[in-house]
Amino acid sequence: MAVITMKSLLEAGVHFGHQVKRLDPRMKRFIFSERNEIHILDLQKTLQGIKDSYELVQSVIKNGKKVLFVGTKKQASEIIEQEAKRSEMPYVNNRWLGGMLSNFNTIKKSVQKLKKLEKMEVDGTFEMISKKEVSQINREKLKLAKNLTGIKDMEELPGAIFIIDPKREQIVINEARKLGIPIIAVVDTNCNPDVIDCPIPGNDDAIRSVALFTKIISDAILESDKEVGIQIVENLNEEDLMSEIEVKNERKES
């Protein structure tokens, strides 16, 4: 069983929002306080978002569907790939190609082409064609692989999508909403939580925070067949929480 503590969230810098001037007013309900012109997120609501997301993910997996991991920003890209691979889920961590969901059949054709080119590399085809042709095929293969490798084994639309930085991934959200695919996302103070089915208030810039949230989703997938849930430990009261919160230069404004 996964155990999440408020202290672990604090240590990962989950509570740090953006500068006050960058607030999306729709995030006000998730704000705990303000320190040095930086918004502090309400970790009680973060814990609730984690719990709701954990339950949704496990429901999706038990119904035989997959969760698509999406995070293309620098801080998230490598983590998204690692955790998606760990839980054997599809992922997009370089660039979202318009239509990856809404025009899925066309995307599948591109994936099939990628698989065909990869097969040519190992079945002896390269030995029967010119070096120039091999070079052209390799260039095309690399171009396709850059954006499609993570979804090569996604045979159907996902049952849910997990997103780091929904403000950046607006095209993903638009496509998912049109198709009725549930969205789980880490929402920072500059995001719109109203377009997310399971918003998790949190810092989407700090690597430790991104890693923590992504690991939680991956753990939920891996534990879905064990009939176990998540244990939330609120091991800090409000007074302790306030004393722990010291806004430092732990996030880079972008």
UniProtKB/Swiss-Prot annotation:
Keyword Ribonucleoprotein annotated: yes
Transcription among keywords: no
Entry keyword set: Ribonucleoprotein, Ribosomal protein
HAMAP family: Ribosomal_uS2_B
Coiled coil: none
GO CC, one annotated term: cytosolic small ribosomal subunit
PANTHER family: 30S RIBOSOMAL PROTEIN S2 PROKARYOTIC AND ORGANELLAR, SMALL RIBOSOMAL SUBUNIT PROTEIN US2M
CDD domains (alphabetical): RPS2
Organism per entry: Borrelia duttonii (strain Ly)
One Pfam entry name: Ribosomal_S2
GO biological process: translation
Similarity section: Belongs to the universal ribosomal protein uS2 family.
Gene3D superfamilies registered for this protein in UniProt: Glucose-6-phosphate isomerase like protein, domain 1 (3.40.50.10490), Helix hairpin bin (1.10.287.610)
Signal sequence annotation: none
SUPFAM superfamilies: Ribosomal protein S2 (SSF52313)
Protein name from the UniProt record: Small ribosomal subunit protein uS2
Gene Ontology MF term list: structural constituent of ribosome
PROSITE patterns: RIBOSOMAL_S2_1 (PS00962), RIBOSOMAL_S2_2 (PS00963)
